Amino acid sequence: MKKQILLSCALAWAVMAGAETIDITTFRYAGPYVVQAPFQVDSVDVNSKTFVSGRLLDTHLSVDVLQQGTLFTGGVLPGSDSGYALHMMGFVLENTRYATAKLKIDGLKRYQLYVDGKKQEGTELALEPATHSVVIKYLSEAGKTDSLKVSVDTDQEGSISLKQDNKKLYTLADVLHGTRFAGVGLSPDGRYLITNYRTTYVGGRSAGSTRITELASGKVLAERTENMQWMPRSNRYYYTRTGVDGRQLIVVDPLTGMETVLVNKLPDGYFQFAPTEDYLLFTMTQEGPKERKEIYEVLEPDDRQPGWRNRSYLAKYDLKTGLLQPLTFGYHNVWAADISNDGRYLLMMTSQSRLTKRPTTLFSLYRLDMQTLQAELLIDKDGFISGARFSPDGTQVLVSGSPESLGGIGKNVKEGQTPSMTDGQLYLLNIADKRVTPLTKDFNPSVQRAVWNKVDGQVYFTAENRDCYSLYRMNPADGKIQQLEVSEDLVNSFSLAQNAPVMAYYGQSASNSDRLYTMNTKKMKSSLLEDLSKDILKDVELGECKVWSFTNSRGDTIYGRYYLPPHFDANRKYPMIVNYYGGCSPVSRNFESRYPHHAYAALGYVVYVIEPSGATGFGQEFSARHVNTAGEGVAQDIIEGTKQFCKEHAFVNDKKIGCIGASYGGFMTQYLQTQTDIFAAAISHAGISDHTSYWGEGYWGYSYSEVSMANSYPWSNPDLFVKQSPLFNADKIHTPLLFLHGDADVNVPVGESIQMFTALKLLGRETAFVAVTGQDHHIVDYGKRIQWQNTIFAWFAKWLQDDATWWNAIYKPKNL
């Protein structure tokens, strides 16, 4: 049955098409724009075609002029009294499911059609879920008028709506495009700020830029494409450029813009300024021995990684003499951890392999006297430390590492538990007597980045705090930790002035993109400096994000959150997607990520994000549950949480629940299907199907297993490696399961998906496998990521919304 839906200009909201035809009666109009026939130098063009008036329709006119247009509801189109003129008529369609339609345009003779700013050949439309602008550009002639009748025909009843409220759905395009922060840096006196940006344009091109701002006035002093950094003491910034004789080091006064060439022939390699500004510390690379291309020896598992045989060493470049003095020599990697404020001492770390015992890589920490080149060993062969920083006076060292660092002095787990090597801790080392104090043993958040501030002597750090990245300040004298009040769920980066109580930081939250702030560290008050989110989310409609936690059968509180679709109706039933990692870290409240939750919700799903046992940010005992469990306990948390969520929220259709995870989360997706039948669809991206093959073949398989399967090996614990592998339980899976994988993945090799896909095919189960050419563990190529994401959306639409249209459009059915 064919019904008509007539929309007048009084309609200010989207009306769902209740039938197969939508008549468009209200447009936004812009025009007329008079165009003239060009002067004809010749009678024909280069292709031997004569000029006809219809070619004026090809005259460029941006569809953006409609933004300033007026409403038009008449049947006879506006014309022009002056020869030929161009006009624009536009309207907006919206669909939360993939839809095909045919646009009927009657009455117009000379027109062009644009959908989302792109010229459309023909009137057949294939609309991915989004808010779409449709523009008809037509050519009028003086004294002649045209009428217009437009309708949209679709076989998918209720799939398309017509919008007139200037709002739009949040889509992957909003995730990919626009400007984001890439870093911040305060000048030593806190008066100026360097802000780094990264902009991605439609089509995938991206570019970086840097801005220098005077904070007091907000005045922009400079904008450049080079990467600029502050000198450590003087309020000047520096950058490098290619000069006639080689790489140049340029120093700039931010107030005057005056440039000084500090070094004319700067050596290659990464460098940092000494705090005293009289020398540069270089990290250099020495190439290791080469193998033949046609046949080659692999010395140890990591030798399969490109560049593994190369070694790093340190050198000091004297800015007065130009002498590049090597500081270290040998075949072990050496890197700098910190330089003392007086420039006298260097903290440096070395690494060495020890494959026969966990941990298989050992680190040593030295204090090197830059004058005598004599080194003092501070920490010897500790595989659990990760970094170190001097105290402002140089008498102590702030050491970062895991709970097992320094003999396990910072462990806080139950008897029989092995701590997670990814749970970040801080320790205080007194150089004089080598006494070590654990600073975060009873602190649940997992430390990420720490800075010892010279101004107030406090340690500022970010830490995973459940699903947030919170900002903290610690007094190293008594170990007291204070959480700082910030305006975002996640602090992604921060900078402290060397000589002033000023901090700059930026971050985002569950429902907004990047925003930049300054903070007075005495008053502890933040001020918004720049809001990139405002432009990214202009006119975008988002659903709500709410916290939801439950108590599992073991008595633990399992935290989570959920996202609702825009225009949520609690009386409806919605399909739900469950997202998790299930590995060593939480799924943070990033607004933009590999799995942008609001973009899923915009398609009509409730999205439940759960933080099961084993994640950092909840305390050492909780994160230790990741070790030697291989999904046991984690799966129970996800299953119990999903069931309880449905029980407490009647708006979820518990027959239409999907789940998705990547990497270890991909393993969890596969493993879950061997444990439960509550899911109607599942997606595993780059998931582990066999712990033994991943352990042996992945570049970091055996080393990550030091975290997840500490002191366990395929021969010593086959129950863990085999019985907990989905491949050996494939016959228990009955859920439609999609495997996604980059075919160049060196972390979790693509064979992990291939072998599981093969098993399910031989078992006659519903499954699909999509490989992404040339992509590694993450799908980072712009165009391929869009196709990858659409594949995910289409799989869920097929099984959770009973609509295979999108899937069949991407992967056309084949008779093979």
Regions found by a protein language model. Give the residues of each.
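A flexible loop/linker signature enriched in serine peptidases of the S9 family
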Residues: 178, 197-209, 240-250, 263-269, ...
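Short loop/turn segments that connect beta-strands within beta-propeller blades
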Residues: 214-217, 253-257, 318-322, 369-373, ...
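Aromatic-lined ligand-binding clefts that engage carbohydrates, nucleic acids, or primary amines
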Residues: 99-112, 134
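Blade-terminus and WD-like Trp-Asp/Gly-His loop motifs, strongest in beta-propeller folds
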Residues: 128, 184-192, 228-238, 271-279, ...
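Accessory carbohydrate-binding/adhesion or oligomerization-edge regions at the termini
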Residues: 20-74, 135-169
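Non-catalytic accessory segments flanking enzyme active sites
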Residues: 181-188, 192-197, 201-204, 281-284, ...
